[in-house]
Amino acid sequence: MTLRLNDLKPADGARTERTRVGRGIGSGLGKTAGRGHKGSFARKGGGKIKAGFEGGQTPMQRRLPKIGFRSKMARDTAEVLSYQLDKLDAGDVDFAALRAANLVPSRAKKAKIVLKGELSKKFVLKGVAATAGAKAAIEAAGGSVEE
């Protein structure tokens, strides 16, 4: 038998007819049409409740107290420890390089190098502050600090 376009049909079970609900007791989905009896889910538009609505109980966002705020006086300077700096490649280090290396959080506007650990590479700091101890360690390793 040859295959013809007019003989093509989908495989068995590939296309099922949409179940029509509320069309008589014999269908198995008559009367309440699978919605049960009464309640919000039985009504049209039922089940659509606001996010955070807890059925009339005081919702979580109103039960818990308000906490904290973002202070305008907050420190916007990130501390970078000298041993973290040593993980970078030797050379020029500026604020953008520190941010690219994920040593400075995105909220910080400035950075300051703090001495902790040893420095083995030569760094030239540009536009980054350093403590007196960190400055001495950088210069001892052959680097410099330009503010």
Swiss-Prot record:
SUPFAM superfamilies: Ribosomal proteins L15p and L18e. It comes from the Bacteria. One of its GO terms (cellular component) is cytosolic large ribosomal subunit. Keywords: Ribonucleoprotein, Ribosomal protein, RNA-binding, rRNA-binding. The keyword RNA-binding applies. Residues 1-61 are annotated as: Disordered. It holds the Pfam family Ribosomal_L27A. Residues 23-33 have a biased composition (Gly residues). GO terms for molecular function: rRNA binding; structural constituent of ribosome. One of its GO terms (biological process) is translation. Signal peptide: none annotated. InterPro entries: Ribosomal_uL15 (IPR030878), Ribosomal_uL15/eL18 (IPR021131), Ribosomal_uL15/eL18_sf (IPR036227), Ribosomal_uL15_bac-type (IPR005749), Ribosomal_uL15_CS (IPR001196). Residues 34-47 have a biased composition (Basic residues). The keyword Cytoplasm does not apply. Residues 1-20 have a biased composition (Basic and acidic residues). Disulfide bonds: none annotated. Part of the 50S ribosomal subunit. Binds to the 23S rRNA. Belongs to the universal ribosomal protein uL15 family. This is Large ribosomal subunit protein uL15. It comes from Xanthomonas axonopodis pv. citri (strain 306).
